[in-house]
Every structure is written in structure tokens, then in C-alpha cells.
């Protein structure tokens, strides 16, 4: 159960964005974006919150704002590899049971949304847990940048057992479609197994890392939430985050 699980929250981040250079350090209402993310992750109160980065500049900025950071290698191909290195350094004795992986470009994410990502690990046998939201905008159903979840309903309509993730419009026929939110919670054993697997055929075809776990027989359960947090990938996204902040008075 969740009460007995020791949890660590990790935020992998780097400066190497091509679409939005120096994205983690972009100013939003007087604070770097990565600091907003760290503030919200810490507010979720899922154990220790640590930023994992290969950038000394990010490390110093995060520390200056009172958050913990750890340096990782610069040659990681994915955030999963980066958080595994951080976990091994932070907890070499293996006391941590579950790791929450929060993307460093979600400055408006609700702390409760982060907390909900752990629920499938608390309630059931999932190896990995993640989040989804029902698609209500018609254009998103055919947008390949909106990743869809194909899954079997669990616990009414608030959770799915993931069978597949795809950029196509799926599943076919009447019924809701679900947008995948790329925030994960891993059992430690699942993360250790996942990073040792090579890229899978469907992962390479769809360009979706989570398919590696499904192809290896790992179970992913999806907690359904009400809203999609704003991910910042472009200048337009950053402008929206700044507008949200100025209108709300804070993120």
C-alpha cells in the first residue's frame, strides 16, 4: 500500500531542447520554469524531490531556489535512463520502493495530479503507472502529437489497463478516446528492468518509449484525470504559461 511505500520524486531535465533553447531556465513570472515544476512536485509531498540534470547551470539555479539537484551523465538517451542513474546515486541501499518521474516542462501541473499518478501502484499490481485524460477536442483525435491510450477499463471509468499507446486514432468505434499524459510512477524493480531493455520494434515505429515496457510484458495502468497539464515545447507554449501565470497571479 502507498502508506508503506518509500517514494522518491525525480525531475529529469537538460538544456538541449532544439525547439526552445534553454527551456528549463525560461523565465515565467520571475522564476525559471524548472523551479516552478520543482515547487509543484515538492507540494505533492511524495517523498524527496530531486532534479536530475547534466547541466551545472541548472544545478546552480535549482539550488539557489532551495531545491535539491543531482548531476547525471550527459549521454543518456531518455529521461528514464537519467532518473535511474539518479536513483542509484541517491539510494544505493535500495530503500526506495517507487519513483515518480515528473517532466521538467510542466510548470502548471497540479500537485494533486502528480499524487494521482501513484494510485495504480497503491491499489493494484501495475509495474508502471501513468496518467490520461478523455479527449474532448475533436481535432486532437486525429493529431499524431496527441498520444492515445488503448486500454481496458478498471475501477469504473477512472482507470485503464494499458494495452497499447499510439499516435493513430484508436480504438476504432463508439466510445471515449484518451490522451496520454507523460508522467510516470515506477516500482523500483520495474524501472530497473525497463532501463535494461533495448528499444523495441513498436517503440521505434511509434516513437513511444512506453511501448518497450508493454512489449516486454510489463503492466501499465493509467489513472484518468480531468485536465491535461500545459507542456512547454515551443515559444507559443511558453507564452501561454506566462499568460496563465499573470492571470492567476501565480502558477
UniProtKB/Swiss-Prot annotation:
Pathway: Nucleotide-sugar biosynthesis; CMP-3-deoxy-D-manno-octulosonate biosynthesis; CMP-3-deoxy-D-manno-octulosonate from 3-deoxy-D-manno-octulosonate and CTP: step 1/1; Bacterial outer membrane biogenesis; lipopolysaccharide biosynthesis
Keyword Cytoplasm set for record: yes
InterPro entries listed in its UniProt record: Cytidylyl_trans (IPR003329), KdsB (IPR004528), Nucleotide-diphossugar_trans (IPR029044)
Catalytic activity: 3-deoxy-alpha-D-manno-oct-2-ulosonate + CTP = CMP-3-deoxy-beta-D-manno-octulosonate + diphosphate
Subcellular location: Cytoplasm
Cited Gene3D superfamilies: Spore Coat Polysaccharide Biosynthesis Protein SpsA, Chain A
GO molecular function: 3-deoxy-manno-octulosonate cytidylyltransferase activity
Source domain of life: Bacteria
Signal peptide: none
EC class: transferase
EC number: 2.7.7.38
The entry's keywords: Cytoplasm, Lipopolysaccharide biosynthesis, Nucleotidyltransferase, Transferase
GO CC list: cytosol
Cell membrane recorded as keyword: no
Pfam families: CTP_transf_3
Biological processes, Gene Ontology terms: CMP-keto-3-deoxy-D-manno-octulosonic acid biosynthetic process; lipopolysaccharide biosynthetic process
Function of the molecule: Activates KDO (a required 8-carbon sugar) for incorporation into bacterial lipopolysaccharide in Gram-negative bacteria.
Homology family: Belongs to the KdsB family.
The protein's name in its UniProt record: 3-deoxy-manno-octulosonate cytidylyltransferase
Species the sequence originates in: Brucella canis (strain ATCC 23365 / NCTC 10854 / RM-666)
Amino acid at each position: 500500500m502507498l502508506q508503506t511505500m518509500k517514494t522518491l520524486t525525480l525531475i529529469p531535465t537538460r538544456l538541449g531542447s532544439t525547439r526552445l533553447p534553454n527551456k528549463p531556465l525560461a523565465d515565467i513570472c520571475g522564476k525559471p520554469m524548472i523551479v516552478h515544476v520543482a515547487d509543484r512536485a515538492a507540494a505533492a509531498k511524495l517523498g524527496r524531490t530531486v532534479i536530475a540534470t547534466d547541466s551545472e547551470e541548472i544545478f546552480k539555479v535549482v539550488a539557489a531556489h532551495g531545491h535539491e539537484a543531482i548531476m547525471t551523465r550527459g549521454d543518456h538517451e531518455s529521461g528514464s535512463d537519467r532518473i535511474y542513474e539518479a536513483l542509484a546515486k541517491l539510494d544505493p541501499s535500495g530503500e526506495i520502493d517507487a519513483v515518480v518521474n515528473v517532466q521538467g516542462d510542466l510548470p502548471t501541473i497540479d500537485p494533486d495530479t502528480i499524487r494521482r499518478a501513484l494510485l495504480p501502484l497503491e491499489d493494484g499490481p501495475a509495474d508502471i503507472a501513468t496518467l490520461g485524460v478523455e479527449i474532448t477536442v475533436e481535432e486532437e483525435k486525429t493529431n499524431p502529437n496527441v498520444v492515445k491510450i488503448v486500454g481496458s477499463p478498471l475501477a469504473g471509468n477512472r482507470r485503464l489497463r494499458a494495452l497499447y499507446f499510439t499516435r493513430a486514432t484508436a480504438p476504432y468505434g463508439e466510445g471515449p478516446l484518451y490522451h496520454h499524459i507523460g508522467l510516470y510512477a515506477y516500482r523500483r524493480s520495474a524501472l530497473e528492468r525497463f532501463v535494461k531493455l533495448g528499444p523495441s520494434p513498436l517503440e521505434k515505429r511509434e516513437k513511444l518509449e512506453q511501448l518497450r515496457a508493454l512489449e516486454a510484458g510489463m503492466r501499465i495502468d493509467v489513472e484518468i484525470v480531468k485536465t491535461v497539464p500545459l507542456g512547454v515545447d515551443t515559444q507559443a507554449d511558453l507564452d501561454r504559461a506566462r499568460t496563465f501565470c499573470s492571470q492567476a497571479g501565480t502558477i
